[in-house]
Amino acid sequence: MFRRLLIATVVGILAAFAVAGFRHAMLLLEWLFLNNDSGSLVNAATNLSPWRRLLTPALGGLAAGLLLMGWQKFTQQRPHAPTDYMEALQTDGQFDYAASLVKSLASLLVVTSGSAIGREGAMILLAALAASCFAQRFTPRQEWKLWIACGAAAGMAAAYRAPLAGSLFIAEVLFGTMMLASLGPVIISAVVALLVSNLINHSDALLYSVQLSVTVQARDYALIISTGVLAGLCGPLLLTLMNACHRGFVSLKLAPPWQLALGGLIVGLLSLFTPAVWGNGYSTVQSFLTAPPLLMIIAGIFLCKLCAVLASSGSGAPGGVFTPTLFIGLAIGMLYGRSLGLWFPDGEEITLLLGLTGMATLLAATTHAPIMSTLMICEMTGEYQLLPGLLIACVIASVISRTLHRDSIYRQHTAKHS
């Protein structure tokens, strides 16, 4: 048992450095090509001329597509192992290391160039990859899946500063057959990754800064639960739209470079209306939480960002949709809150409360993981007083979504790439 805890600690450290490496590579490319040192792609897009804002995501997609197509042609005669931690957990726990690194590099290109896709997907992949590499050298084969799970949880903890949610992500979403006793090493890896990540970044701040002064009362619980119902209906719709967009891009029968370039071009066109469509949505979420905009502004940015996310994910841009889903949920919750605010005197607080609820419940509706989704929002924002209400709302959203759409976003992803 102590051997496992020691290995879990090492895996957590490796994962933290893997995440930090991707983050610093991203900052370097942003500085080199976008002359941006703020760490915000929205700021980068704002400072670019319109033609550069239009073409940059397309060029990034083209470069990533050429990289992926070139690697595919180079290795077409080789047997293929999984290049995704979800696939590796469902098979024999082995990775195609070179292909996974190429996929991560392609993700770096599309993320840095502004595509509306999550950078955290590549971070978690690299963390799981580092764990797998260590495990194959120093642990028996029957433990490989456990250490990949630890690496993925640690990567999520380092990326989102949410170790408990990262651990439950593994338990609820990826490793449902995992025995409860195996959660110990997963939690150790996640916590160690967070601590090492804090040391690397010289900060232990929460991922999102929120000033919510509301005391949750009976009326607020009713609003939170109703938001859960709304998210339970919106989750399957979002998954259906993502499926439809993917099929639409595939039906065009374009080569990968042109398919990714088209997705990037759509993002570029949308960014002419608002630069907020660039990136995974982190900075836009933070700005909304700091000062909730008016109803029409939220609606406009929401529609543009939704189309950008659908274009990026549908075109096959390598990356995650976890953080973009958080923004979509926030916008849905805030739109609902702004509508209700017309009848309540404390409309600002309701908008903020339901925005946070929307983040958690849409995440639960798309992942079918209500406990993880609840803890994720609480850990990212520090608003633990919302825990009881969010848990109820997330369970409701998950049940409704599962009834309407059998597969979660991750099962849908696995089926699409199998």
Swiss-Prot record:
GO terms for molecular function: voltage-gated chloride channel activity. GO terms for biological process: response to acidic pH. Its main location: membrane. It is found in: Cell inner membrane. Keywords: Cell inner membrane, Cell membrane, Chloride, Chloride channel, Ion channel, Ion transport, Membrane, Transmembrane, Transmembrane helix, Transport, Voltage-gated channel. The keyword Ion transport applies. The keyword Repeat does not apply. It is a multi-pass membrane protein. The chain crosses the membrane at residues 5-25, 54-74, 146-166, 168-188, 222-242, 258-278, 291-311, 316-336, 352-372, 380-400. Pfam families: Voltage_CLC. InterPro entries: Cl-channel_core, Cl-channel_volt-gated_ClcB, ClC, ClC-type_chloride_channel. GO terms for cellular component: chloride channel complex; plasma membrane. HAMAP family: CLC_ClcB (MF_01203). Probably acts as an electrical shunt for an outwardly-directed proton pump that is linked to amino acid decarboxylation, as part of the extreme acid resistance (XAR) response. Belongs to the chloride channel (TC 2.A.49) family. ClcB subfamily. This is Voltage-gated ClC-type chloride channel ClcB. It comes from Escherichia coli O127:H6 (strain E2348/69 / EPEC). The gene is clcB.
